[in-house]
């Protein structure tokens, strides 16, 4: 049955879905905190799988709604670009946890807390940026939040240099160097995903200011 309301769409539908996706990104990092604190115990991927699947459902719902809604609060291309950028965050986090479980003997005793703390702050900042789309797209506020995100990415880059220095110090077995390098770079990629999503939001707000 034809529905004019469905065609026009609810004004806040996409904001709600994008905020839910940003929340899943932050939730996946919170699960990562618990995961890395329990590496000496039996750990499971359930939380990561649930978060990534939930975000995939949200992403699919956004994609379908974009093409079935006549009027959208944001441009369709912007909605899809941001949705895809957000989905890559829990997807990459899940990939990290899978790799850890492939070689647990090489990660016991390894401290990922500095990188993960930066990820927590980055996903929290990103969530605030997504919420700003509904709250009037305040350009100055979004600029401030994006600058914070860029700062966190810079701090993550510095931390990578510290980690590389340790890896190549000769204190680790060759196989462990390979494993840890891969894991460190996956965490770095998560914050890069946050940066990418933040840049999309900044572009949207600038275009609509």
Stretches with model-predicted labels:
Residues 1-209:
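Cytosolic, long alpha-helical scaffolding segments
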């Amino acid at each position: 049955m034809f529905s004019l309301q469905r065609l026009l769409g609810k004004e806040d539908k996409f904001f709600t879905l994008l905020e839910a996706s940003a929340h899943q990104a932050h939730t996946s990092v919170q699960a990562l905190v618990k995961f890395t604190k329990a590496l000496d115990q039996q750990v499971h991927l359930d939380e990561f799988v649930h978060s990534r699947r939930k975000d995939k459902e949200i992403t699919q719902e956004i994609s379908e709604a974009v093409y079935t809604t006549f009027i959208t609060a944001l441009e369709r291309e912007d909605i899809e670009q941001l949705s895809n950028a957000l989905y890559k965050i829990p997807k990459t986090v899940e990939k990290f946890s899978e790799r850890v479980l492939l070689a647990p003997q090489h990660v016991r005793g390894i401290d990922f807390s500095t990188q993960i703390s930066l990820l927590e702050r980055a996903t929290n900042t990103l969530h605030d940026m997504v919420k700003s789309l509904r709250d009037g797209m305040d350009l100055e506020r979004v600029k401030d939040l994006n600058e914070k995100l860029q700062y966190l990415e810079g701090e993550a880059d510095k931390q990578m240099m510290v980690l590389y220095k340790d890896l190549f110090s000769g204190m680790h077995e060759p196989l462990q160097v390979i494993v840890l390098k891969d894991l460190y770079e996956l965490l770095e990629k998560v914050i890069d995903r946050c940066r990418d999503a933040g840049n999309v939001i900044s572009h949207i707000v600038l275009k609509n200011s």
